[in-house]
């Protein structure tokens, strides 16, 4: 079975093999803030970095990953422009923690959520915002999801909170391949990176697809249905198992915004 960080590497390899270039930028993206990625290996004697995925580079179809300076506004603005003029590539900007995206709020308001309406400018920029309350302090817990949801209108952006490796794989593959470019905001996991319950089978990557909603059926006829998203699902599931409750059904929302999400919730 695969954990989330492994699936993150798999989608990059698959996209490169399929001819889609990938570019990742963030303050700690090469190693990964939670020491989960390690896409650049350094020689301890020379300090030279080696990127294993670069072996899959073919001409302009290449993999690039950069550790950026500590200016969210500057880097996000640059990556927005990069994604806008480079439709064939998957461009990802990653906040070290989701909270830090507030420093770049002007870029989000002026360009990411409104450029299509104002100037007919499309962008497939993807934002990775590590999200979750794991006791790391008040500035390391929330990407202020409510602000992004307030900015949603007329399918201007996509907001997703995948909790399984297969979901991450299919979501980002879809973002790269889809010719209809829309900014994608992904609330990426923190503690779930190493949660043994948050794993996927290899077959889920090869045969599955991204699921907007995941329903965990109760063993008996359900008396209650609980709607949730993100890591809260695993907290609820643990409690259900601990109490041996068999009549509660959990419905997990993975796609929080596009009109498709609203239609599916109504159904």
Which ranges hold each PLM region?
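General beta-strand structural signal in soluble alpha/beta enzymes
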Residues: 24-26, 65-67, 91-93, 127-129, ...
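Non-catalytic terminal/interface segments that mediate subunit docking, oligomerization
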Residues: 1, 5-88, 95-116, 204-215, ...
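Single conserved hydrophobic/aromatic residue that forms the stacking wall/gate
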Residues: 2-7, 11, 257-267
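A short acidic (Asp/Glu
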Residues: 34-37, 101-106, 136-140, 169-173, ...
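Active-site phosphate/pyrophosphate-binding segments
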Residues: 121, 134-232
């Amino acid at each position: 079975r695969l954990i989330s960080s492994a699936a993150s590497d798999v989608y990059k390899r698959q996209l490169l093999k399929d001819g889609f270039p990938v570019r990742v930028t963030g303050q700690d993206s090469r190693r990964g803030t939670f020491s989960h990625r390690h896409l650049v290996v350094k020689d301890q004697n020379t300090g030279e970095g080696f990127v294993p995925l670069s072996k899959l580079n073919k001409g302009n179809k290449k993999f690039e990953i950069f550790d950026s300076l500590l200016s969210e506004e500057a880097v996000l603005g640059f990556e927005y422009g990069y994604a806008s003029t480079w439709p064939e590539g998957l461009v990802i900007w990653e906040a070290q923690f989701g909270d830090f995206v507030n420093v770049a709020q002007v870029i989000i308001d002026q360009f990411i959520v409104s450029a299509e309406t104002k100037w007919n400018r499309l962008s497939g920029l993807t934002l990775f915002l590590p999200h979750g309350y794991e006791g790391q302090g008040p500035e390391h817990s929330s990407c202020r999801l409510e602000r992004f949801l307030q900015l949603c209108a007329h399918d201007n952006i996509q907001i997703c909170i995948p909790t399984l490796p297969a979901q991450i794989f299919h979501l980002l593959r879809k973002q790269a391949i889809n010719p209809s470019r829309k900014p994608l905001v992904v609330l990426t996991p923190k503690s779930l990176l190493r949660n043994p319950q948050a794993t996927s089978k290899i077959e889920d990557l090869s045969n599955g697809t991204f699921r907007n909603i995941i329903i965990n059926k109760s063993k008996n006829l359900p008396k209650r249905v609980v709607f949730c998203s993100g890591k809260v699902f695993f907290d609820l599931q643990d409690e259900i198992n601990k109490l041996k409750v068999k009549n509660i059904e959990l419905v997990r929302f993975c796609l929080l915004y596009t009109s498709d999400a609203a239609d599916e919730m109504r159904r």
